[in-house]
């Protein structure tokens, strides 16, 4: 069963919007096994130019699904995000079935409610071509210093060792121009 955490920025999350989100995104519940509890983090934003942005993140075991859409109509953005998430689930399951690994089998996360996507036309798209490998020495520093290093290098992310916890972290530049921090466990 999917639980919902719905937030609104510059918009009141009315009962009608909440019901619509829960109905549309709730349809994805059929793709998850009964034993897995998933929380959908939904962020609804309205900008001054009357554009609506919908962001949905579904963290599941070994995979995090995320989709967003911006349009003039909040409801059509919700529809489009639901379609994107469904496609991600199907594509993920197809890839995992094609390349068996030591990871969790997809049947343990996603149920067998649907057939895998026919991706004969997308084989080239699925191929990952790593064109460069870098080896870096991680320096102990705090997040602020890592952001400064990232900016000096002109990169969108920077991997570093946190001086306090000794853990490997990543700072990154978000699409809104602010910064994010990923802390590994």
Swiss-Prot record:
Domain remarks: The N-terminus (residues 1-126) is homologous to YaiA and HPF of E.coli and can associate with ribosomes, while the C-terminus (residues 126-185) seems to be a functional paralog of E.coli RMF.
InterPro entries tied to this protein: HPF/YfiA_ribosome-assoc, HPF_long/plastid, RHF-like, RHF/RaiA, Ribosom_S30AE_C, Ribosom_S30AE_C_sf
Gene from which the chain derives: hpf
Region ranges (Required but not sufficient to restore ribosome dimerization, in vitro will replace E.coli RMF in ribosome dimerization): 126-185
HAMAP family in alphabetical order: HPF (MF_00839)
Record GO terms (molecular function): ribosomal small subunit binding
Organism field: Lactococcus lactis subsp. cremoris (strain MG1363)
Family matches, as PANTHER family: 30S RIBOSOMAL PROTEIN
Biological role stated in the UniProt entry: Required for dimerization of active 70S ribosomes into 100S ribosomes in stationary phase; 100S ribosomes are translationally inactive and sometimes present during exponential growth. Able to dimerize E.coli 70S ribosomes in vitro.
Subunit structure: Interacts with 100S ribosomes in stationary phase; alters the relative position of the 30S and 50S subunits.
Statement: the UniProt record of this protein carries the keyword Ligase: no
Keyword DNA-binding (UniProt): no
Domain of life: Bacteria
Assigned protein family: Belongs to the HPF/YfiA ribosome-associated protein family. Long HPF subfamily.
GO cellular component: cytosolic small ribosomal subunit
Cellular localisation: Cytoplasm
Pfam families: Ribosom_S30AE_C (PF16321), Ribosomal_S30AE (PF02482)
Primary location recorded for the protein, binned into one broad class: cytoplasm
Single GO biological process annotation from the record: negative regulation of translational elongation
NCBIfam families, A to Z: yfiA
Effect of loss of the gene: No visible effect on growth until cells have been starved for 5 days; cells recover from starvation less well than wild-type and are dead after 14 days starvation. No 100S ribosomes are formed even in stationary phase.
Region (Probably still associates with ribosome): 1-125
This protein's UniProt keywords: Cytoplasm, Translation regulation
The name this protein goes by in its record: Ribosome hibernation promotion factor
């Amino acid at each position: 069963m999917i639980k919902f955490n719905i937030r609104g920025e510059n918009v009141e999350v009315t009962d009608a919007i909440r019901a619509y989100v829960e109905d549309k995104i709730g349809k994805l519940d059929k793709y998850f096994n009964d034993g897995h509890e998933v929380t959908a983090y939904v962020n609804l934003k309205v900008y001054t130019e009357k554009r609506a942005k919908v962001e949905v993140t579904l963290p599941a075991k070994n995979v995090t699904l995320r989709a967003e859409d911006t349009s003039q109509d909040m409801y059509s953005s919700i529809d489009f995000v639901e379609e994107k998430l469904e496609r991600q689930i199907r594509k993920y399951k197809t890839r995992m079935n094609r390349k068996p690994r030591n990871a969790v089998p997809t049947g343990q996360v996603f149920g067998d409610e649907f057939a895998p996507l026919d991706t004969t036309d997308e084989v080239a798209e699925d191929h990952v071509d790593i064109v460069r490998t870098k080896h870096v020495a991680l320096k102990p520093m705090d997040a602020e210093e890592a952001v400064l290093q990232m900016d000096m290098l002109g990169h969108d992310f920077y991997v570093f060792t946190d001086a306090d916890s000794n853990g490997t972290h990543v700072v990154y530049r978000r699409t809104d121009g602010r910064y994010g921090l990923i802390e590994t466990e």
